[in-house]
Amino acid sequence: MIKNKKIIIAISGASGAIYGIRLLKVLKEQNIETHLVISDGAALTIKFETKYSIQEVKFLANYCYDEKNLGAAISSGSFKTAGMIIAPCSMKTLASIAHSMEDSLISRAAGVVLKERRKLILMTRETPLHIGHLENMLKVAHYGGIIAPPIPAFYNKPTRINDIIDHSITRVLDFFDIETNLIKRWSSD
């Protein structure tokens, strides 16, 4: 498990803001420093899809930044982090990263993470996908990003929506060697 590390969490406007919120909760329990960016679209999605206020979500993070603040600490490669998780990642955010637009703090921080060869995990949320979406995913993967859509697994027999959410975020946290006891891991036994 990583100790005294910093992880950037971004919540974009795609459906599934609960993934980002649950990540923040788990990382807070693990005493891992989080740097949060909530897009304007995500603020609307959080209000529409969850019981959380924006302030409650921000309270889960150690540091919060406005998505328009391109001068924030996380926009510089000299600010050391373990990497970044965008949960959920909209197709707009994916496209911005794939084409190096860096027109918001989310896409700027993602670009920094890629150029510094740190971990960038995109929990992409869209279905069905057209060829442009797939090409953007391929570009980001070529740059070193990891495309990790929150696809449920059923071998652990989920009975609650939180079981499905926890499975997806555990898989993402595995990339950072962060151990949790949220799920039953696959075993042939």
UniProtKB/Swiss-Prot annotation:
Molecular function (Gene Ontology), one example: carboxy-lyase activity
Organism domain of life: Bacteria
EC number: 2.5.1.129
First-tier enzyme category under EC: transferase
Binding locations of FMN: 13-15, 39, 90-93, 125
Pfam families registered for this protein in UniProt: Flavoprotein
InterPro entries: Flavin_trans-like, Flavoprotein, UbiX-like
Catalytic reaction equation(s): dimethylallyl phosphate + FMNH2 = prenylated FMNH2 + phosphate
Coiled-coil ranges from the UniProt annotation: none
Alphabetical UniProt keywords: Flavoprotein, FMN, Prenyltransferase, Transferase
Keyword Flavoprotein assigned: yes
Cited function: Flavin prenyltransferase that catalyzes the synthesis of the prenylated FMN cofactor (prenyl-FMN) for 4-hydroxy-3-polyprenylbenzoic acid decarboxylase UbiD. The prenyltransferase is metal-independent and links a dimethylallyl moiety from dimethylallyl monophosphate (DMAP) to the flavin N5 and C6 atoms of FMN.
NCBIfam families in UniProt: PRK06029.1, ubiX_pad
Name the record gives this protein: Flavin prenyltransferase UbiX
UniProt organism field: Rickettsia prowazekii (strain Madrid E)
